[in-house]
């Protein structure tokens, strides 16, 4: 989803009719000639494999090697199995077409290349039709540990392996379908929180202990350690009502992680019609990202050490 904020208000060489969030990376691509002929109405484009540089492939290898060494025993088995099934490797930025051959056979999903963040309704439309929009470009070598918007490593390494799992794949499609409805009902803030605390930063309980499944964690060296090992954050049992009222942080480690018991639990949470829930929750105050409230199934209350004081989203 579109979570980054627009950059400066300088003139932008965007194609006529462009309605997306103008981030630095999009401005850069428009300035380099990305136009309405290259960029389709649904914001997709051909993966420009000819534009990957040696530095791009080296960055992929560096990031891949770090996570490959770190994630066994931290990432959930379903993620690791998906990574193996897709045949993703350290060799360089993968071909989306090659990954799609395996992905389509497994769950009917496909990756579509996009230049960056896309408008919410476009994003939901893709998910509802089992298409995952992935940024084609790679972060710079000086951005290995943080960048403002998701790049190809975050989107492909972080998100795509779980799309091999049938239950998670169904959840993502249901989320897209729900997003289209939420947009009409003015409830995108609540649904965005569900995405953030599950797809991006979710943990899962397993017989071997807590494991990571959120893409924002599995694609990050430092948060892969922090999410499981640090005493600072809260870890709270999954509750869709609670999550939809909980604000979040985009610029630092999470103050709270929500823990599911299974992907089936996650999928089942999307089955009901959310319309009455939106109406009920819309009248209630939101919670801060680090709040622990009555009724929480608290696995551990964080020490709050190192928490930033600036505002949540």
UniProtKB/Swiss-Prot annotation:
CDD domains referenced in this protein's UniProt entry, alphabetically: pro_PheOH
Pathway assignment: Amino-acid degradation; L-phenylalanine degradation; acetoacetate and fumarate from L-phenylalanine: step 1/6
Enzyme Commission number: 1.14.16.1
Residues where Fe cation binds: 154, 159, 200
UniProt keyword Metal-binding present: yes
Record has Oxidoreductase as a keyword: yes
Cofactor descriptive note: Binds 1 Fe(2+) ion.
Protein name: Phenylalanine-4-hydroxylase
Chain's gene name: phhA
């Amino acid at each position: 989803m579109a979570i980054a904020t627009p950059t400066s208000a300088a003139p932008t060489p965007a194609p006529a009719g462009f309605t997306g969030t103008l981030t630095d990376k999009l401005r850069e691509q428009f300035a380099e000639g990305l136009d309405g002929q290259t960029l389709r109405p649904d914001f997709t484009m051909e993966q420009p494999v000819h534009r990957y540089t040696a530095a791009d492939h080296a960055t992929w290898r560096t990031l891949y090697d770090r996570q490959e060494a770190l994630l066994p025993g931290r990432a959930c088995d379903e993620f690791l199995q998906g990574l193996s099934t897709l045949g993703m490797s350290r060799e360089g930025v993968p071909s989306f077409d090659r990954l799609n051959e395996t992905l389509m056979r497994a769950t009917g999903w496909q990756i579509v290349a996009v230049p960056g963040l896309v408008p919410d309704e476009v994003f939901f439309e893709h998910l509802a039709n089992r298409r995952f929009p992935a940024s084609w470009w790679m972060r710079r070598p000086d951005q290995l540990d943080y960048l403002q918007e998701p790049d190809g490593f975050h989107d492909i390494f972080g998100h795509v392996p779980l799309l091999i799992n049938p239950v998670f794949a169904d959840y993502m499609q249901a989320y897209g379908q729900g997003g289209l409805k939420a947009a009409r009902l003015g409830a995108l803030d609540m649904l965005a929180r569900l995405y953030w605390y599950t797809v991006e930063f979710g943990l899962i309980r397993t017989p071997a202990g807590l494991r990571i499944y959120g893409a924002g964690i599995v694609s990050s060296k430092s948060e892969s350690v922090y999410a499981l090992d640090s005493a600072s954050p809260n870890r709270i049992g999954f509750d869709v009502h609670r999550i939809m009222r909980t604000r979040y942080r985009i610029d630092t480690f999470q103050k709270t992680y929500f823990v599911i018991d299974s992907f089936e639990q996650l999928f089942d949470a999307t089955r009901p019609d959310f319309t009455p829930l939106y109406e009920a929750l819309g009248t209630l105050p939101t919670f801060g990202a680090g709040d622990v409230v009555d009724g929480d199934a608290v696995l551990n209350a964080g020490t709050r050490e190192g928490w930033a004081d600036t505002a949540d989203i």
